[in-house]
């Protein structure tokens, strides 16, 4: 017999078999063929359409998937007899083919589980490869894809669980904070180009009021007034460990004070006022940056001991700014520092190379607010004045701008949180639509978490500083949970940013390096030796 005859014979058998199913109905077919008392043959059964006794017999026996030894009866029948053509076994898993399996509850459960498992596998495969089954190979127009994260079955439960929390967070209004302490500060200068607050890790707050320096501590309150002068104070700064207080005045006088002493140990005079001071945050050296009104930056090493006190001029930077320097800050380990000026310019320097800036970024207003991120070494935030009103974020390793945030107000200070992925900002002059004077934003979402309105209209926050404490074991300075803000209404307010607050963004993980990963630290340019430790 030819192969064509065999194919036609199979087709004829299938057609008659399907006709039988349709005529007798599926119920009759199931009860006759699959009933519990149905007779099951132990040998293959040939369907003869002309034989009424075999016309309604299912051509599948219970031994269909039973294995036979080589050379057994089944193999011989299949090879030597046409009885091997008595059954058609579909070798496909196509969902459109007719299933002839036993439709018991167990079979249905197995089919459903298999189908669900297959569907889950397909969804996981789509998610992993970022493709969709609906995509057409010959569709050349770019179709808008749905969110692939919604297709991953393993994410469905967690997404449903977090959906309420996410929506609540997105729809939640910023929190309002109340100060836990308020100090009067008569004659506090309302001047964007000065820096009149400094906190010592020993617990003292230095405040420049007109020509005087006041010291305040939690235990003693206002303690004493340092030497009076006829020239107003324009900048104050405590050294890293709090041993030295540097004071700059509008006439260019630079003084260095020791605790419990009534006269300065060192006094230097420069022409032009001193708007900002910044100590290098390390124990090994007392290096100080001095920002001048003419745009120059002086770099001093201060030798400070019981027997000797002197200031050594290390360098004078003249190629950074053309106008007054109003912002200076170091990164956490003293390897870089940044300066901002009234010439709308931000300059980034290597601490080991003072000859020229590493990068220069142009803004649209004077830049006073500068802050390096303590847990991401490559990140620098800059805040510009009333003609710009933007916070910009830069990568300190390649000089590229990462992001920016329009605040609608003059930015007077920025402080990164040492514990959470967020930063606080104080504002000066603002638009009518922007009323807050102090805010906390999440990073990198840039969502406003805290918004503090002014107690009286038309005031601005001019100066601010984060509190810190000295670790007696390591001798190092650690940031704490408060921010101190001086406003143009001659008040100084203390705000609590402690861990008990519910509005915080995600927490910075505990680390011994910057990222708890040598690979990431290598990418960030970190050699594993740092001079500070964040909790």
UniProtKB/Swiss-Prot annotation:
Q: Which InterPro entries does this entry report, sorted A to Z?
A: Cdc20/Fizzy (IPR033010), WD40/YVTN_repeat-like_dom_sf (IPR015943), WD40_CDC20-Fz (IPR056150), WD40_repeat_dom_sf (IPR036322), WD40_rpt (IPR001680)
Listed Gene3D superfamilies: YVTN repeat-like/Quinoprotein amine dehydrogenase (2.130.10.10)
Q: Which SUPFAM superfamilies match?
A: WD40 repeat-like
Bilayer-crossing residues are none
Q: Name one GO molecular function term.
A: ubiquitin ligase activator activity
Instruction: Please verify whether the record's keywords include Repeat.
Output: yes
Looking at the record's lineage, which domain of life comes first? Eukaryota
From the UniProt record, list the WD repeat ranges. Answer: 189-226, 228-267, 269-314, 320-359, 362-404, 462-505
For this UniProt record, give its keywords in alphabetical order, as a comma-separated list: Repeat, WD repeat
According to its UniProt entry, one GO biological process term is: positive regulation of anaphase-promoting complex-dependent catabolic process
Classification via PANTHER family: CDC20_FIZZY FAMILY WD REPEAT PROTEIN, CELL DIVISION CYCLE 20 CDC20 FIZZY -RELATED
Query: Which family does the entry's similarity section mention?
Result: Belongs to the WD repeat CDC20/Fizzy family.
Q: What is this protein called?
A: Uncharacterized WD repeat-containing protein C13G6.08
- Native source species: Schizosaccharomyces pombe (strain 972 / ATCC 24843) (Fission yeast)
């Amino acid at each position: 017999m030819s192969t064509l005859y065999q194919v036609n014979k199979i087709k004829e058998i299938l057609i008659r078999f399907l006709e039988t199913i349709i005529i007798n109905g599926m119920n009759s077919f199931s009860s006759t063929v699959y009933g519990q008392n149905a007779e099951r043959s132990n040998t293959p059964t040939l369907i003869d359409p002309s034989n009424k006794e075999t016309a309604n017999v299912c051509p599948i026996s219970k031994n269909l998937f039973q294995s036979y030894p080589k050379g057994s009866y089944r193999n011989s029948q299949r090879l030597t007899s046409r009885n091997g053509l008595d059954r058609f076994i579909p070798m496909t898993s196509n969902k459109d083919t007719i299933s002839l399996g036993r439709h018991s509850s167990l079979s249905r459960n197995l089919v459903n589980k298999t189908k669900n498992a297959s569907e889950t596998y397909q969804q996981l495969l789509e998610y992993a490869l970022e493709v969709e089954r609906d995509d057409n190979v010959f569709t050349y127009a770019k179709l808008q894809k749905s969110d692939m994260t919604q297709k991953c079955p393993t994410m469905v439960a967690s997404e449903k669980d977090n959906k309420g929390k996410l929506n609540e967070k997105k729809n939640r209004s910023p929190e309002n904070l109340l100060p836990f302490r308020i100090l009067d500060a008569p004659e506090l200068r309302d001047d964007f180009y000065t820096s009149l607050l400094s906190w010592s890790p020993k617990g003292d707050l230095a405040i420049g009021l007109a020509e005087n320096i006041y010291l305040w501590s939690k235990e003693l309150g206002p303690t004493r007034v340092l030497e009076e002068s006829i020239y107003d104070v324009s900048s104050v700064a405590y050294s890293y460990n709090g041993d030295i207080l540097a004071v700059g005045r509008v006439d260019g006088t630079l003084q260095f004070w020791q605790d419990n002493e009534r006269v300065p140990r060192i006094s230097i005079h420069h022409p032009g006022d001193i708007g900002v001071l910044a100590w290098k945050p390390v124990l090994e050296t007392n290096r100080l940056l001095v920002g001048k009104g003419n745009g120059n930056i002086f770099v001093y090493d201060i030798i400070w001991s019981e027997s000797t006190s002197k200031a050594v001029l290390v360098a004078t930077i003249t190629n950074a700014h053309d106008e007054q320097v109003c912002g200076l800050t170091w990164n956490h380990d003293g390897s870089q520092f940044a300066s901002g000026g009234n010439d709308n310019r931000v300059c980034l320097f290597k601490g080991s190379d003072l000859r020229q800036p590493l990068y220069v970024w142009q803004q649209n207003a004077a830049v006073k607010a500068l802050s390096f991120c303590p847990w991401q070494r490559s990140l620098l935030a800059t805040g510009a004045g009333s003609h710009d009103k933007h916070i910009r974020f830069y990568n300190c390793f390649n000089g590229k701008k990462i992001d920016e945030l329009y605040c609608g107000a003059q930015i007077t200070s920025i402080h990164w949180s040492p514990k959470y992925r967020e930063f606080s900002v104080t504002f000066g002059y603002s638009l009518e639509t922007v009323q807050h004077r102090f805010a906390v934003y999440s990073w990198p979402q840039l969502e406003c978490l805290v918004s503090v309105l002014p107690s009286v209209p038309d005031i601005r926050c001019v100066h601010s500083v984060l509190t810190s404490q000295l670790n007696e074991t390591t001798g190092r300075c650690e940031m704490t949970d408060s921010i101190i803000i001086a406003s143009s209404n001659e008040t100084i307010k203390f705000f609590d940013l402690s861990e008990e607050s519910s509005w915080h963004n995600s927490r910075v993980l505990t680390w011994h390096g910057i990222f708890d990963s040598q690979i990431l630290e290598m990418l960030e340019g970190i050699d594993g030796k740092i001079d500070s430790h964040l909790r």
